[in-house]
Amino acid sequence: MIAIIFAHPSHDSFNYAILRTVTDKLNAEGREYQVIDLYADRFDPVMNVGDLTHYESGGTESERISMYQDILSKSTVVFFIFPIWWGEAPAILKGFFDKVMQPGIAYHIGEDAIIPGLSVTRTVIITTSEAQSVIFSSYIEGFFIPYTLATIGLTGAEWYNCEDADTGSRNHREAFLARIASIA
């Protein structure tokens, strides 16, 4: 199965056009996928005391978090689609990792190391920004991929960033969508 984690509040956005491009391609190929639309789901990214108590025991009272965990545990491919705001992913995506990627699900504590709990062989990160990709490569390629994703078993990472997403030309955005359709 393919999981798509979408982290943008507007369905009128270029990020949503990216999501539609990916899902249109998957539908055309008859591939099974599940979209996790964090904003549409009204996902609460704030970890409160109750969440923390359950997190430490590897559980949750949230049916939605359990559903997200189930989707991820069945997925071999994961897409992340999000804008880069203030140099990193939106807070809702950070909260998704904080609350969903629990011990016993996303990872296990070994004697000497963390053992990944997920078995994702292809992880596609699609971002939008106004600045050049090189500015964000230390965050995405130097931290997010090796320390956040690989640690929990999201491997085979590919990153695609649409620079000048808001100020670039329509042709620029259409070319990016065509590129995404070719790799989806």
Report residues per predicted region:
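Glycine-rich phosphate/pyrophosphate-binding loop and the adjoining helix
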Residues: 134-135, 139-184
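Short, structurally constrained coil/turn elements
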Residues: 27-29, 119, 153
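Short, glycine-/small-residue-rich phosphate/pyrophosphate-handling segment
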Residues: 108-151
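Cofactor-binding loop segments of dinucleotide-utilizing enzymes, especially the Rossmann-like FAD-
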Residues: 7, 38, 127-128, 162
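Glycine-rich, flexible loop/turn motifs
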Residues: 51, 114, 156
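N-terminal beta1-alpha1-beta2 submodule of the flavodoxin-like/Rossmannoid cofactor-binding fold
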Residues: 1-105, 109-110, 167-184
